[in-house]
Every structure is written in structure tokens, then in C-alpha cells.
Amino acid sequence: MPEVPVLACIALDQGKIGNVHQVTSQVIIKKEADMKIALALSGGGFRATVFHLGVLARIAADEQDLFSQVTYLSTVSGGSLCTGLVYSINGFRWPTAKDYLEQIVLTARRMMTTYDLQGSLLRRALRHLGSILETRSDDLSELLREGWGVTAQLHEVPSHPRWLINATCYETAKNWRFEPHRMGDYVFGYSRDTNLPLADALAASAGFPGLIGALALKTGERTWFRYKHSGAEDPYTSLAVQQTWETTPITPAFPEVHLWDGGVYDNHGLEGLHDFSHGWRNNVDFLLVSDASGTSSAPPYRQRVKALYFMVTGIMMDQIRSLRARAVLDRITQHDDDGSYLKIGNSCHKVLTEARRTQDLETYCPMCMDETAVSQAAAFPTMIRKLSQAEFDLLFRHGFEVADYTLYAHHADTSLPARFKFLGYESIRNQIGF
């Protein structure tokens, strides 16, 4: 397929929301027909947040201008925090690849290694001992506004890329999605009144039970509806088409809903992108799943309540994640759906060997993190505390490299929809500044 060079691109000035533009000197190699790329960013605390930042860096570094072709984002917990941080740093607009690599990554590193989100949350709880067992979701939302600058309202987020922020509704046990134009789930119903803080949606998506807890959303303050059209819940039906479908007004079944960590229901954020029967949703050419769920280990036996808690949050959730991951891999390997599954903890040697590219082992593996460092990244605990620079760099580099060698291993020789070269982490060092 011939490639068309584009000599310049438009980039947003840092700190501006689209009023001032400047032409950069970045050279982009643009494909004949752009892909519609969907990103699913999993949960996993700051382990996931930084891993995903590294994955995004690999996409931004690609010569095919893939970053501008990101059309859909579906995020959970740490993935939602990652996306919210990127938007906040860039004035609540999706950045250019150049701005992401040269400005946003370094700013995100500084913020995550100087501001202690978890410590601030704990200090707030200790100041109010009478409510220490209550949900801390409201506190997390406020800290995201104060410490990370997540000050926009949900409805102010641009419609492109289309961003689904996934939570779990306790009352319906379904995947509750926050979008700029609507929120809700197909059992409870939907509301177009999304005049609420973006930080609230992020806090709900990251509200792990027992650690942060649920966001209580009062329903009587908004109008709600259901679609009469059977396919209207498809999140990737165009907004213009959705607005032509008939709706039925409804009275909320509950005066408030409690919205928990999206990872309780679907830690990969796949339900809005993938259907078990039909594969990718409409208008998705390439699905990129970034899975930083972490690795499970065998804990010592726990009795009574602790045993039950592990059964629910450990074994059962791990099985749900495994089933969804297998379904995606089946679509990629056995059907026509194109995409890639990027798993934390996968080393270069493992990925190239499984892809039957053993001839590349001596060339590329020495350029990547060794097995010990990869294992350290995968075993990093699920938390939202301040990171050291070494911790950030470990997780970020691992995310970049997993994306780099996985995309190369499985898409180097194909033209549908993209060919990926191995870039190596050193290729972006000068741009990211560390």
C-alpha cells in the first residue's frame, strides 16, 4: 500500500483549549485510509495508569500517525485515571503525538512522583474518624480536582475521541458508562444531563470496594429515558443516528445509584467495544487492549469472611477477566477482527517466541527490559500512592516495550490494517526527557 507523506501537522499549544494553534515541523507518514482505532485501558491502580501511559507513547511514536486515528477510548479504574490525567494536562483535548511525547509524558511523571493521591486520601479519612468506614469516592474526586487539575465537567469533554468511562452500578449489577453526551446502563436507563464533574466519573470508575467505595449519584435531579430502538445501546452507533431514535421517559427505579469500580464488572473495559457473538463493535478497524491487571499469586488460606472476600474479589474476578481476554484473542486469531492484546508481564522473549519469531530474539531482546524487571513491573501492587521516579520509569518503559514488541511480533508482515516496526525504547528517550 503506498504511503502519502504529510509535511506538517497542527498541534495545540500547551494550556490552550483550541483557541491558538501552531504548525509544528513534525513529519507524519500517513496511510492512504485512516484506521478507526479503539483503545481499551484496563484497571489496576497506578500500575495500570503508568503502563498505559507507556503504551500510548508507543502509539504516539509510530510513523503511521496512529495517535490521531484513536477514535474510541474505553477505560476502567487506573485506565480512567490515565486518560483523565492526559486530558487534564492538555487542556481537556486529545493531544497530538508530538505534544504527548514532548510535553505530557514528562508532566505526568512529575505529577505522579510528587503528589500523593493515596496519602492525601488517608489523611482526610483520619481527620474524620467517625466516617472512616464510609466511602471515600467524594474525597477522591475532590483530590483529583485539587491535585491533578481535573476541573472540567463531563459534558465539556470533546466528543472525539469518543470516551467511555466504565463503572459498575450496584443497583443493576451492570456496566454503567459515563460519556460526555449521556450516562447510565441499559437496565437502569440513560440521562443526557451530564453536567457533573469529570472527576466524579473518574472516582466512580476507580472506586474499588473496601478501599475507596462507591460514588452515590442522586437520580431525581435528572431526567431519564430508555431507547425504543433495540440497537441504541451500541456505544459506537453515531451520535447523529442515536439522536434520531425514539426514547421513552422513565421514572428512576432508585432515588440514587451507587457506582463502584468498573473493574468489578469488566476490568478490561471491553463490553462497549466487543460482542461475544459478532466481535468488534461498529466502526472499529483495530482494537488495542492494554491489560495491566497484574499477576495473581497463591495467597495463604484465609478463614470465614476473608475467605469469602478472596473468592469474590480474587478467584471469580480473575476468571471473568480470563474469559473476556480469551474471547478477544479468539476474535483476533480465528476471525477477521484485527487488533492486539498487550499484557503486562509479557517479556520480549516470551512474545517473540510465541509468535515464532525466534530469529529476532538476539536482535531485539537485549534492547528490552530483562525478565527480572518485567516480573517486578507485573508484580507492582494495586495502589494510588506517590511513585518514585524509578517506579514510574519501570512501569512506563514496560508499557512502551510490551506494545512495541507485541505489535511488531504479530503485525510486522501484514498490511491489514497496519504494519508495525520495532522501534526500541531508546528511540523516544530524547523526546520524553528521561
Regions found by a protein language model. Name each.
Residues 32-40, 45-138, 179-181:
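Patatin-like phospholipase
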Residues 45-49, 80-83, 172-174, 266-268, ...:
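Flexible loop/turn segments at secondary-structure boundaries
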Residues 47, 117-131, 157-275, 429-432:
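Active-site gating loop/helix substructures
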Residues 66, 136-159, 164, 177, ...:
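Conserved N-terminal structural segment that caps and organizes enzyme catalytic cores in eukaryotes
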Residues 87-93, 178-185, 219, 273-277, ...:
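Short secondary-structure boundary/capping segments
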Residues 253, 259, 264-267, 272-277, ...:
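C-terminal helical/tail subdomains of lipid-metabolizing enzymes
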